[in-house]
Amino acid sequence: MDNIYTPQTLAAVVRRTPDVPSFLKDLFFKDTKTFLTETVSFDIVKGRRTITPWVAPNSTAPLSQRTGVTTTTYKPAQKKEKRSITENDIKVRLAGEQPFVGTVSPEERAIQLLAQDTQELKDNLVRSQEVMAADVLLNGQAHIKGEGIDDVVDFNFTNKETLAGNARWGQSAAEIVANIIKWKKKCLKASGFNPNTLVMNSETLEVMLSDKKILALFDNRRTEMGLLQFEQMAEGAVYVGFMGGQIQCNVFTYDNYYVDPTDGQEKEMVATGKLLVASDMAKFTKLYGANTIIPGEGMDFVTYEGEYVMRRLVTRDPDAAFLELQSRPIYVPFDVDSYFVADVL
């Protein structure tokens, strides 16, 4: 049975275990880069869009300066979790296993447990990265908080606004269409990217749709009896439709929650009143530092490059084994001026 826990086998199991679908992570953070070191390096672009100048015949070319690029080196903290495997686990029928139908050997059940535990551990890790994606997009920073660590990676995000008084959506002086057009133009001017995506939760959408000007901009093909026809997507995400006119954006709601391991409280991914105006064409990147571990008994330290690394740990008296999955992720908005966040309620 030990052969299923070799570093090579565990690496293959992790690779073949699918990621749980994630809305913000999958929609925006499409690029992935891994490092052979525990530290990662990334660039943040802020600056004007320059053009090539005219020059007189036979003149030398002027020197182009690299402006607006900030390079940062950072050592991501580890995210890791383990699942225990005891003698009783491989002898007792698993959930969903048919009773009294054939006999499942401990060896076969160990293989089933490996697949099940890997999926659940990876699901937890992917969900935690979805929380990081939300933090980066909605707050312009990654707050790394856990046992023995409380760190903030600030990406110098400045495209944000809080509406006040009667200018808030749903109030008498609200100008929802004008607000969105203004925020889109600000992103376009600063980054060159024209936002094509709006994300909010369902409560914020309800207020937005109370504006007749907004409702009139949605694609008529998605409207029946005056009501929008929604399309379910990843967990908690709904495609509302395409908003035309001067806005030209796909509209999504995202109602998803997570339990914060630091305080045990259930929290929203996208808070009520938050609006994300973004382009899914801009560069948002998932970076992963390397993990250095002792992969098995009698082995030396080994450094692994990749998104995840899994190993088996063993304790004696009482005898128990643990399956541990770990990662060093940091999510980075390379084009930090390409999106805008507003508090609209």
For each feature predicted by the language model, list its residue ranges.
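N-terminal alpha-helical "arm" segments
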Residues: M1-S41, V332-L345
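Short alpha-helical segments and helix-capping/turn motifs at coil-helix boundaries
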Residues: D26-L27, I181-K185, E307-Y308
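Assembly/oligomerization interface modules of large self-assembling protein complexes
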Residues: D31-P99
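A general structural signal for short secondary-structure junctions and capping/turn motifs
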Residues: T32-K33, C187-G192, T197, R312-T315, ...
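A structural detector for beta-sheet-dominated domains
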Residues: V45, A95, N156-T158, A278-S279, ...
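Long, contiguous amphipathic alpha-helices that act as assembly "spine/axial" helices in icosahedral shell
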Residues: K79-N156, N179, K186-E203, D319-S327
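Extended, solvent-exposed, turn-rich assembly/linker loops in the middle of proteins
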Residues: D150-L227
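Sequence/fold signature of self-assembling virion shell proteins
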Residues: L215-L345
